[in-house]
Amino acid sequence: MGDIRLAPRFVMGFLVAATLVGLVACASDRDPPPAEPSFYNSLASAEAKVDAGMAASMISGYRTNNGLSSVQVDPELTKLAQAQAQAMAARDKIEHNVLRDFNVRMRSSGFDAKLAAENIGAGYHTLAQAFSGWRDSPPHRKNMLLPGATHIGIATAYAPQSKYKVFWALILAAPDRPRG
């Protein structure tokens, strides 16, 4: 009779152990947590690159919430923004005319714009920080909400020797003629 009493306890113990092993196995099979959104990625390194598509999406959302058109990334504007960001980083200066006047740069860019505006900045280490800084600054907000803008170029440049580390340039524009 003593053996019969041990059997249910043994079976119960075995079932509890098997259940625990199964739960542990299930827990380890879970998908890894999702990656952090790219707008939180630090751009304070030489190999980091701003996610232009994410920037266009954020700016488009902001614009459409304010009754304006969305924007798309343009390669010519991106090249122009990259040159501006790199020039500011090389000189450790935050200014629109570090290369040449913005209007002169636009005319020589290959992007025939009927309207354009430029936001620059430094010290923001993520796209989220730059976007928030521009949104909270009246002149920069006005540029992000430029009526008629349909294209953007955005770029960063890393300057490890600078107190700012990351320099930004954002260009919003509308082409004079539809772009293909």
Language-model features: where?
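Bacterial signal peptide processing site
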Residues: 27-30
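Bacterial N-terminal signal peptides that target proteins for export
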Residues: 2-14
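Surface-exposed patches in mature extracellular/periplasmic domains of secreted proteins
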Residues: 65-79, 92-102, 117, 141-156
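C-terminal motif of bacterial Sec signal peptides marking the signal peptidase cleavage site
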Residues: 21-25
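A short alpha-helix/helix-coil micro-patch that ends at or immediately precedes a cysteine
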Residues: 34-89
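Disulfide-stabilized extracellular recognition modules
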Residues: 2, 127-180
